[in-house]
Regions:
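Extracytoplasmic copper-binding redox domains, predominantly the cupredoxin/blue-copper superfamily
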Residues: 2-11, 16-114
């Protein structure tokens, strides 16, 4: 009985250590079908999203100021989005895509497509 209890305690401790060692970054998101990027407080959140090829990313402006989304290669470009307006783009090819707000160039983000 003591042996079984000891093994259960060791297994529980190992599980806690494994979960605690798993990195988690709140500024990064992973999605398979679609993901959302919130535009608020003059920043994109999350700043980096990782999605599977074929996924759609939707940016929604929750600021009181207009914002845009423009890829550094020109692959996708929104118009000015007012409060509560959205822009979506489907990412078909793997790669890393950087984007910015053309109105506020310090607002930047990245989409990683796997």
């Amino acid at each position: 009985m003591v042996f079984v209890r000891s093994r259960l305690l060791m297994a529980a401790a190992a599980l806690v250590m494994l979960v605690g060692a798993t990195p988690w970054n709140p500024s990064t998101a992973l999605a398979t079908d679609s993901t959302k990027v919130v535009v608020k407080d003059f920043m994109f959140s999350p700043t980096t999203s990782t999605v599977m090829a074929g996924s759609t990313v939707t940016w929604t402006n929750l600021d009181d100021e207009p914002h845009t989304v423009l890829s550094d290669t020109g692959l996708f470009k929104s118009g000015a989005m007012d409060t509560n307006e959205s822009f979506s783009f489907k990412f078909d090819k793997p790669g890393t895509y950087h984007f910015t707000c053309t109105i506020h160039p310090r607002m930047v983000g990245t989409i990683v497509v796997q």
